[in-house]
């Protein structure tokens, strides 16, 4: 962890050089970039040309003879048309070339990055990165890079040329005035630079805070069942709010600072106008300048200076892109220690399959303080089966990781056929090894595709044979789409047994020489296990096999059994040899497992029902993203973390039909009234902000008025000129100061209102989501912008428009109407321009969603990808998913280019029309010189003001949409609402549970009937064990008692009261749930145990609970003891260790009802005995419901109930049920007997 944080801190200074960004450009890109740059330079010069023409125009209007004037104006107006055509062409080329090349190059970088990530060694994933980071970089960082090397480069070139051109013209036309005005430029630049610098710092802080808040969301949603079962909703909400508070403070500070920056800039600009007017007048009087010349210089310097000010978005983008590229380019350059793409290394004709580990020393890169092997040796002769047994955490699975060469040993050798693994070509040797692990990883694609990972271009016949051999054909044929069924993210749509059989089929298809089985049958119930075991026996013949197993029954037949203890082999031999030595380690393990002879039947482990996302020890999969595991109603919309710029929100990938619904939902328009209502507490703040916004809004039209007055003034006689120039200069300064005060005030108040709103909405949403019956939610990315900034804009724009219109119509109503008719074009033009300044990249992100899903799946299952050498397969799939978005990006580039070009075309044509009609009006005496300019400036500046501010606004449609989705969340009342305080509570709970005629289907799989009219009574203080086949609905019983779901019909009663009438949070506090896949939070062991107790637990209680769960000893032996962080999803602990912590958490709650869902299935014999003892102690005097595979756990139950086809087929004690000949229970038991 420490390394990570230090990396974050120095991340700020690491950037690549600007030109390095383009290192992946090909020839086409170079051509596009060259054309784009030339066009951009050309486009940059249009504005300086425009000021020249404008100067001529003013002089034309300044002539006294009306007829002569009209002729002169016409001459100049034609030049506007030429300019319009020219600018249209260059603007199109500039934008389209740069956008297209940006899209192309970023696609290349994305592909290369994924390719490099897939080739990294597994250790890299343990220590350097995680899925979230990879996906974040692929979806977020590449967009920053694309932004820095696409349209922004063109824009920057354009602005730079405008700056240079403007100054060249100014110095050519009037060097004295230009020199004086230049002195103002540094001030403008400094203000702008300081603002963007501070802003980016603040934005960084805000993002960190939001990222942390996003993390809280991710963890909570990921573990929603655990949160809910332990009524941890309030804790989660509090933690979330504390993170939001930090983010809120930065939002307000950002508002204030951006306000000051903008205010200062505008103040400086207005003051320099004042200076220019006064000094210009002086030059006209003393140096013989004319009015056109002065105006020309003023405009040229200002366009030049303004364009320099507008470069900041580009410069920010360059900085962000260079920083983002640093990490990605580093990764692309990184050559892994163990490289799957490295084709050097020998390839043999064939291998025999002798495996040897020679004096191996090893530690996991992520836990360098724990030595796993110190001088470990093992030999596996070819064609033989060696089984590794031993306690949880002893290093059995590590042997498999070393043979697959996921890691290299620190010293010692791993040999195959006496050749060091390091000398063999990695891809080739992995193709000879088949791996079936305890937690089979499936990709979010079809069953057929999943199996085909085993072999390039496998035929349908081969796939068919593989599924038949793996005993998967039966269940696949039952599925509506057969082999084309989608398996869901990480295989969530399949039960454990089904997933495992697919994984085995995948290995069979590969037809490997060496087979590695890591707990391959631990997830199966008796029947599937026997079937799969047969399949594996078929698979194992004539292959070298290494088996890791908890269950000794599965390995009795192995040629050699090796007992691993604390990283050493303490005993090895065949089952029969070792069982002779009663004191030997093996015999002790066997005794532990059996308890007594007839219990050797214990491999009774019906697998949990359809709904379970399995995992024993999660050490292997640090899959960061996962759907809300277990049959949650959202198992389809798996949560993905999009580290969205504003809000690392949780984004939901729905299936198609969901998306259609989504769209319908989205069109529900949100009234601003409703949003405003949420903002009610901030009304005073909003009023102050609005007043400031109104004042700020009047500034632009007044500025137009001043411009025209001052132009008029330049043509007045010297005496009046002198007096007027002083007056107008002061007015400009006053205007500047107004801005300086009003903008920060406006931004600050709206920042507070907006920030509070977003904080309120986020915490409301989060609170709502946590209390949802396990449901999806959307991100609140842009919600703040709607009230905060959008309201400020609306007020400011209204003020701008009204003032502008008043000035124009009082000046000259005829011309005002003509210009007004054209002003929509000006608005469109300004909007388009500013939009290009802010960029288009947000859309790219959504388009690459599907491609990111492919990457996400591959990275979170990197071991599977590596062991099946499927890197190229993944890359092909990825490229395929990228094609659409890439083409789209190119299309977008061309369209935007055209739009940009035409917007310029319109602008210059409108100017032309305006002045020609003005000249006409003057000729017929309907207007004066001053009026023409008054109207023109008031309206054009009004239009520009409106359009720029609107475009800078975060897209309010987006904001409206997200508002709609937020209100959907806030309006949705969950059917099962844990936040509601309604419902009864009992003084004391006895713990009688009854299911009365319950029928049920999962909301997400309405075609599968789980319970039909199920009846079951569980007397208080007794233990009831549920057994049955995989998918029969045993775990569902537990989900229904916890009230994760309501029955479709029938009732569930506790102490004769229907559970739907109880207060939900109280009900859940009465129960302790320990599930098969314990979910821990990424915090310390201490806080994970304390999670069980609402209102906090004392240190003594925590230690007592840990002792009762047999966890105290191993916790104390860890370097940091109770302060050890368990890692994401508990990856730093072994399965048995996690399970004991989960039990301690349940014990601390001291529940009346104990629900054990496969609580010991993930443990090895010794931990199981220890944990089982702990459970036996806890079960006393509590009503206990146990779902289990193993007979030992079940035999002592007071009642055993067999769940079959959605009803209870039999119930009674073990002895009674055994007597029913041909009974369901007896046959389940016989199955086991024969399996042994």
From Swiss-Prot:
Positions that bind ATP: 390-397, 1028-1035
Topology term for the membrane: Multi-pass membrane protein
ABC transporter domain: residues covered: 355-591, 993-1230
Compositionally biased residues, Basic and acidic residues: 594-616
List of glycosylated residues: 542, 631, 653, 1082, 1181
Residue ranges of every copy of the ABC transmembrane type-1 domain listed in the record: 33-320, 686-958
Subcellular location: Membrane
GO cellular component, one term: cytosol
Stretches that traverse the bilayer: 38-58, 80-100, 158-178, 179-199, 257-277, 288-308, 685-705, 725-745, 785-805, 806-826, 902-922, 927-947
Keyword entries, A-Z: ATP-binding, Glycoprotein, Membrane, Nucleotide-binding, Repeat, Transmembrane, Transmembrane helix, Transport
Protein's UniProt keywords contain ATP-binding: yes
Main localisation: membrane
Region Disordered, annotated ranges: 593-616
SMART domains named among the record's database cross-references: AAA (SM00382)
Record-level Gene Ontology MF annotations: ABC-type transporter activity; ATP binding; ATP hydrolysis activity
Similarity comment: Belongs to the ABC transporter superfamily. ABCB family. Multidrug resistance exporter (TC 3.A.1.201) subfamily.
Protein name: ABC transporter B family member 9
Species, as recorded: Arabidopsis thaliana (Mouse-ear cress)
């Amino acid at each position: 962890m420490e390394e990570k944080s230090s990396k974050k801190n120095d991340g700020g200074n690491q950037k690549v050089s600007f030109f390095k960004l383009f290192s992946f450009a090909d020839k086409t890109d170079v051509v596009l970039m060259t054309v784009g740059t030339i066009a951009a330079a050309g486009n940059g010069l249009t504005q300086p040309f425009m000021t020249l023409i404008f100067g001529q125009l003013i002089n034309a209007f300044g002539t006294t003879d009306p007829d002569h004037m009209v002729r002169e104006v016409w001459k100049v107006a034609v030049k506007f048309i030429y300019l319009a055509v020219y600018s249209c062409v260059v603007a199109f080329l500039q934008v389209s070339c740069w956008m297209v090349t940006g899209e192309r190059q970023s696609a290349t970088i994305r592909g290369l990055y994924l390719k490099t990530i897939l080739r990294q060694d597994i250790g890299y994933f343990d220590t350097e990165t995680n899925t979230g980071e990879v996906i974040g970089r692929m979806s977020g960082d590449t967009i920053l890079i694309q932004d820095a090397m696409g349209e922004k480069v063109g824009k920057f070139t354009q602005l730079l040329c405008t700056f240079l051109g403007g100054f060249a013209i100014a110095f050519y036309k009037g060097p004295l005035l230009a020199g004086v005005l230049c002195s103002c430029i540094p001030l403008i630049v400094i203000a702008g630079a300081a603002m963007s610098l501070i802003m980016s710092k603040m934005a960084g802080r805000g993002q960190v805070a939001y990222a942390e808040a996003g993390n809280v969301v991710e963890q909570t949603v990921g573990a929603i069942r655990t949160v809910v079962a332990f009524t941890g909703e309030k804790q989660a909400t509090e933690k979330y709010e504390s993170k939001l508070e930090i983010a809120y403070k930065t939002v307000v500070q950002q508002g204030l600072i951006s306000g000051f920056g903008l205010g200062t800039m505008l103040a400086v600009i207005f003051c320099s106008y004042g200076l220019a007017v006064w000094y210009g007048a002086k030059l006209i009087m003393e140096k013989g300048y004319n009015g056109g010349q002065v105006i020309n210089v003023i405009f040229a310097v200002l366009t030049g200076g303004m364009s320099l000010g507008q470069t900041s978005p580009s410069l920010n983008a360059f900085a962000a892109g260079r920083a983002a590229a640093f990490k990605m380019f580093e990764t692309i350059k990184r050559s892994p220690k163990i490289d799957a793409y490295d084709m050097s290394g020998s390839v043999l004709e064939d291998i025999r399959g002798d495996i040897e580990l020679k004096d191996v020393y090893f530690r996991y890169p992520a836990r360098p303080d724990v030595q796993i092997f110190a001088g470990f040796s093992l030999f596996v002769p070819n064609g033989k089966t060696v089984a590794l047994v031993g306690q949880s955490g002893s290093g059995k699975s590590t042997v498999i990781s070393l043979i697959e060469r996921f890691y290299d040993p620190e010293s010692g050798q791993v040999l195959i056929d006496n050749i060091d693994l390091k000398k063999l070509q990695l891809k080739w040797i992995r193709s000879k090894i088949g791996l079936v692990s305890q937690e089979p990883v499936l990709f979010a694609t079809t069953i057929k595709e999943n199996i085909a990972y085993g072999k390039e271009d496998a035929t349908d016949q081969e796939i068919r044979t593989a599924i038949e051999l793996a005993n998967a054909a039966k269940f696949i044929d039952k599925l509506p789409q057969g082999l084309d069924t989608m398996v869901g993210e990480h295989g969530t749509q399949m039960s454990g047994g089904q997933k495992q059989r697919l994984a085995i089929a995948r290995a069979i298809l590969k037809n490997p020489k060496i087979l590695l089985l890591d707990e391959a049958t631990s997830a199966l119930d008796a029947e599937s296990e026997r079937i799969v075991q047969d399949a594996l026996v078929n698979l194992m013949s004539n292959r070298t096999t290494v088996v890791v197993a908890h269950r000794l029954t599965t390995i009795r037949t192995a040629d050699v059994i090796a007992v691993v203890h604390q990283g050493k082999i303490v005993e090895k031999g065949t089952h029969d040899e070792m069982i002779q030595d009663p004191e030997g380690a093996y015999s002790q393990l066997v005794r532990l497992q059996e308890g007594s002879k007839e219990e050797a039947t214990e491999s009774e482990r019906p697998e949990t029902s359809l709904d379970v996302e399995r995992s024993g020890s999660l050490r292997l999969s640090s899959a960061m993203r996962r759907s809300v595991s277990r049959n949650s109603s959202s198992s389809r919309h798996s949560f993905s973390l999009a580290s969205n710029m504003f809000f690392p929100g949780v984004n939901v990938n729905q299936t198609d039909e969901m998306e259609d619904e989504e769209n319908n939902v989205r069109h529900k328009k949100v009234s601003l009234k409703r949003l405003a209502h949420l903002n009610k507490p901030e009304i005073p703040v909003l009023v102050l902000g609005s007043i400031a916004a109104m004042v700020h809004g009047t500034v632009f039209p007044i500025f137009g008025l001043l411009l025209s007055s001052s132009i008029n003034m330049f043509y007045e006689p010297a005496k009046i000129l002198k007096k007027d120039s002083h007056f107008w200069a002061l007015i400009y300064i006053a205007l500047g100061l107004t801005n300086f005060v009003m903008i920060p005030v406006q931004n600050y108040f709206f920042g507070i209102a907006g920030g509070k709103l977003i904080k309120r909405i986020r915490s409301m949403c989060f609170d709502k989501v946590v209390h949802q019956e396990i449901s999806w939610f959307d991100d609140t990315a842009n919600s703040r912008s709607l009230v905060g900034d959008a309201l400020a804009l609306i007020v400011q724009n209204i003020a701008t428009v009204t003032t502008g219109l008043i000035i124009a119509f009082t000046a000259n109503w005829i011309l005002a109407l003509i210009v007004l008719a054209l002003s929509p074009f000006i608005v469109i033009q300004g909007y388009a321009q500013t939009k290009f300044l802010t960029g288009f990249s947000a859309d790219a992100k959504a388009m690459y969603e599907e491609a990111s899903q492919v990457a996400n799946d591959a990275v979170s299952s990197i071991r599977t990808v590596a062991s099946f050498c499927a890197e190229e397969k993944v890359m092909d799939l990825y490229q395929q998913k990228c094609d659409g978005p890439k083409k789209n990006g190119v299309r977008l580039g061309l369209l935007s280019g055209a739009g940009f070009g035409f917007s310029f075309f319109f602008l210059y044509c409108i100017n032309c029309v305006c002045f020609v009609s003005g000249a006409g009006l003057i000729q017929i005496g309907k207007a004066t010189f001053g009026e023409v300019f008054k109207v023109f400036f008031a309206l054009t500046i009004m239009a520009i003001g409106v359009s720029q501010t609107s475009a800078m606004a975060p897209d309010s449609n987006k904001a409206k949409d997200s508002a709609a989705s937020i209100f959907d969340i806030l309006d949705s009342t969950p059917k099962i609402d844990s936040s509601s305080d309604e419902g009864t509570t009992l003084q004391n709970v006895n713990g009688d549970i009854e299911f009365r005629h319950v029928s049920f289907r999962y909301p997400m799989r309405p075609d599968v009937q789980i319970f039909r009219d199920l009846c079951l009574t569980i007397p208080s203080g007794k233990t009831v064990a549920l057994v049955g086949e995989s998918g029969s609905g045993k775990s569902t019983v537990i989900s229904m008692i916890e009230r994760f779901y309501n029955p479709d019909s029938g009732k569930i009663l506790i102490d004769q009261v229907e559970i739907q009438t109880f207060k939900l949070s109280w009900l859940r506090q009465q129960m302790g749930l320990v599930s098969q896949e314990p979910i821990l939070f990424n915090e310390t062991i201490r806080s994970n145990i304390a999670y069980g107790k609402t209102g906090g637990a004392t240190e003594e209680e925590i230690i007592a609970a840990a002792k009762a769960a047999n966890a105290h000893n191993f916790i104390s032996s860890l370097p940091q003891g109770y302060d050890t962080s368990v890692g994401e999803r508990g990856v730093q602990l072994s399965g048995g260790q996690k399970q004991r912590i989960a039990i301690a958490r349940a014990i601390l709650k001291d529940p009346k009802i104990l629900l054990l869902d496969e609580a010991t299935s993930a443990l090895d014999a010794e931990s199981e005995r220890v944990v089982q003892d702990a459970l036996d102690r806890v079960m006393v005097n509590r009503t206990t419901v146990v779902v289990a595979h193993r007979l030992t756990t079940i035999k002592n139950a007071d009642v055993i109930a067999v769940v079959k086809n959605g009803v209870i087929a039999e119930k009674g004690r073990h002895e009674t049920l055994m007597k029913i000949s041909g009974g369901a229970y007896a046959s389940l038991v016989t199955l086991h007997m024969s399996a042994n």
